[in-house]
């Protein structure tokens, strides 16, 4: 049975920095473990019966944290085990859209990439391998949050369906990136280095630590953490996606760039879903707090792609990349219902039809002509070809 985590008051970024994100992920605080009575001195059987009576009658308890009870997404929902009748049609539509976009790593042809890979300059190979290392680790971190926090907190069935499917897709993304590394990198020591990027690469570790800190933060509200992980999938991924699309513009690495199309479409939908969940919240973080989270993510991503792993290695302009990350952040702010922060234009014309909004041409055009037939039409037929 899933349990409801009770968000407490928010904490400052300075306090967050003092928490070791890896040590903060504890399994010891699961609420579905019954409270221990070992510390209660049971002096008589009458007292013992009274204690057990109190445990058996939770309805008599008065909630000390009304914020959870005030949130339709988070409060106890006895109907969470069944899907119908649909109550949140917009959330359900998002789930069906994700379901219709299902794909697997085996469908991506990497046979032509090896020849391209060997023809790349050393700087280009260095950049691509390190970006893939970040991606391979980051999807696992997103799943850690979905499993440990969001899926346990949210009590709305439609949202749980989406989170469950998102977990499956993040696994496929992680498999795809691992397969790309395994295909391109022949040296076993270099592969091991890339697969352990969170420990071996400081620039990747910095981004991972920021995300892990939000997972382990027991005091941040659900709303703050939704914004933080919208930033992870909408901002932390955006520049790296753009850099791979830059390779596509140059006609390079068809397998890598096709998988990038599929994954960026998925992440755009995940980011849109986070914004939808945010809109359903009754108690939202203030615009100032949201700006603080978003600008922090922007600074980390700009540093990653212009200093730690500069896009100039593949011939891109670092200044324009900084601007693109700010453009993506502004778009996310608008989607969350707030004002733009940076007020800049999209500097990359090749990214005009490739955004992380989810309202892109990806889904409508059926990227790579791939979409599960009939899923979005709500129709059932027995005359399909098998």
UniProtKB/Swiss-Prot annotation:
Phosphorylation on Ser-20 relieves the inhibitory effect on Wnt signaling. Phosphorylated on Thr-33 by CDK1 and CDK2; predominantly in G2 and M phase. A motif (Cy) lies at residues 49-51. GO terms for molecular function: metal ion binding; ribonucleoside-diphosphate reductase activity, thioredoxin disulfide as acceptor. Signal peptide: none annotated. Fe cation 2 binds at residues 170, 233, 267, 270. Its main location: cytoplasm. Disulfide bonds: none annotated. The keyword Ribosomal protein does not apply. One of its GO terms (cellular component) is nucleus. Fe cation 1 binds at residues 139, 170, 173. The keyword Transcription does not apply. Its EC number is 1.17.4.1. Binds 2 iron ions per subunit. Belongs to the ribonucleoside diphosphate reductase small chain family. Heterodimer of a large and a small subunit. Interacts (via Cy motif and when phosphorylated at Thr-33) with CCNF; the interaction occurs exclusively in G2 and early M. Provides the precursors necessary for DNA synthesis. Catalyzes the biosynthesis of deoxyribonucleotides from the corresponding ribonucleotides. Inhibits Wnt signaling. Two distinct regulatory sites have been defined: the specificity site, which controls substrate specificity, and the activity site which regulates overall catalytic activity. A substrate-binding catalytic site, located on M1, is formed only in the presence of the second subunit M2. This is Ribonucleoside-diphosphate reductase subunit M2. The gene is RRM2.
């Amino acid at each position: 049975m899933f349990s409801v985590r009770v968000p407490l008051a928010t904490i400052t970024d300075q306090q967050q920095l003092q928490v070791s994100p890896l040590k903060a992920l504890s399994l010891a605080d699961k609420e579905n473990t019954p409270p221990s009575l070992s510390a209660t001195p049971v002096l008589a059987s009458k007292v013992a019966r009274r204690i057990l009576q109190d445990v058996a009658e939770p309805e008599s308890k008065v909630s000390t944290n009304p914020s959870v009870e005030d949130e339709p997404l988070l409060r106890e929902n006895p109907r969470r085990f069944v899907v119908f009748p649909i109550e949140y049609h917009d959330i359900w539509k998002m789930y069906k859209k994700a379901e219709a976009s299902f794909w697997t790593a085996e469908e991506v042809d990497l046979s032509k990439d090896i020849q391209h890979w060997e023809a790349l300059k050393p700087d280009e190979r260095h950049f691509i391998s390190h970006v893939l290392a970040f991606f391979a680790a980051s999807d696992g971190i997103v799943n850690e949050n979905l499993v440990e926090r969001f899926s346990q907190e949210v009590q709305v069935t439609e949202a749980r369906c989406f989170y469950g499917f998102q977990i499956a897709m993040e696994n496929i993304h992680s498999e795809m990136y691992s397969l790309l590394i395994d295909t391109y990198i022949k040296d076993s020591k270099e592969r091991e280095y890339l697969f352990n990027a969170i420990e071996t690469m400081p620039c990747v570790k910095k981004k991972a630590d920021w995300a892990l800190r939000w997972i382990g933060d027991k005091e941040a509200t659900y709303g703050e953490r939704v914004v933080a992980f919208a930033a992870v999938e909408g901002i932390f991924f955006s520049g790296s996606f753009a850099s791979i699309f830059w390779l596509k513009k140059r006609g390079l690495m068809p397998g890598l760039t096709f998988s990038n199309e599929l994954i960026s479409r998925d992440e755009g939908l995940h980011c849109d879903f986070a914004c939808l969940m945010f809109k359903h919240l009754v108690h939202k973080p203030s615009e100032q707090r949201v700006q603080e989270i978003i600008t922090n993510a922007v600074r980390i991503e700009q540093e990653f792609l212009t200093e730690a792993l500069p896009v100039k290695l593949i011939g891109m302009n670092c200044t324009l990349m900084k601007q693109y990350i700010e453009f993506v952040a502004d778009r996310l702010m608008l989607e969350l219902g707030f004002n733009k922060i940076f007020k800049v234009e999209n500097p990359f014309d090749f990214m005009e039809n490739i955004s992380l909004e989810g309202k892109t041409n990806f889904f409508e055009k059926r990227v790579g002509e791939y979409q599960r037939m009939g899923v979005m039409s709500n129709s059932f037929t027995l005359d399909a070809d098998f």
